[in-house]
């Protein structure tokens, strides 16, 4: 696999990314600012976190593959739109300058500078019983905890 060099502590939190699942004809995507890159079971992996109330959750549940796409700074406003609108309410991608394209077994965007094609190898709901009280107060007072998806990175699209 080719090399993928990023600042792992900034690429999600400061730059943001899109997690997407489905096909270019039937998919959903959402902006994420929580995630991780690493190694699990001697495989390169990407980890993302999605709440069950999000429309993208449904697509992650029914698809074996997902993508994590990174963008140049000029698309940050588009990512802001995709993080604040729901695909349940209409074609939110049409409100942006992004264009969905096929990514082998999933979907990405023509404008992405890099996309990780991921095969789901593990998922688990985060357990509030194992969280500090201030995390629950800040993130989970009124909504269910995130589901963690770990995907083996099976390809990098540039």
What are these regions (language model features)?
Residues 1-32, 36-158:
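Active-site-proximal mixed secondary-structure blocks
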